[in-house]
A protein has these predicted regions:
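Basic nucleic-acid-binding interfaces
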Residues: 1-160
């Protein structure tokens, strides 16, 4: 059986985490060109620290990442670095965002983190399906203008 570990000089390690973080005020800003740029920035910053991105998905108002962080970094140390440096890079490229966010803080203060063990495949699948789940949730919030039982158009106010 092949072990799924990485190694340093005298250390074998497997430190995988599911991390979720969001823009300040949970604004739906991560789409289009800015989504591509944020993805490139995060990949570059992870590469600098030797952090492997196993799976990632950027939704409009949050980012999911499954990462392997070397044991020489704590999760909080890495997240402080990632969110701090990426904020500076985002505001450097999109200076107009300073007025929306103020104080050069693009991300919310906190984040969600969970360790990953035997459930790695399930978490990868969950992250891959995040965009579809967000889209489905958005569709459910749209008003129905067709009666689901008869298929006939519905006058406004009938369902309210």
């Amino acid at each position: 059986m092949k072990l799924d570990t990485s190694s340093l000089a005298h250390t074998q390690w497997e430190c995988k985490y599911h991390i979720v973080f969001a823009p300040k005020y949970r604004r739906q800003i991560i789409y289009g060109k800015i989504k591509q740029d944020i993805g490139q920035m995060i990949r570059k910053l992870c590469e600098y620290k030797g952090v492997e991105i196993i799976e990632a998905e950027a939704c409009k108002d949050h980012i999911h990442m499954l990462v392997s962080i070397p044991p020489k970094y704590s999760v909080s140390q890495f997240m402080g670095y990632l969110k701090g440096k990426s904020s500076l890079m985002i505001f450097e490229k999109y200076a107009n965002l300073k007025y929306k966010y103020g104080n050069r803080h693009f991300w919310c203060r906190g984040y969600y983190v969970s360790t990953v063990g035997k459930n790695r495949k399930a978490i990868e699948q969950y992250i891959r399906n995040q965009l579809q789940e967000d889209y489905t949730e958005d569709q459910m919030s749209i008003k129905e203008y067709v009666d689901p039982f008869t298929g006939e158009p519905v006058k406004e106010g009938k369902w309210e």
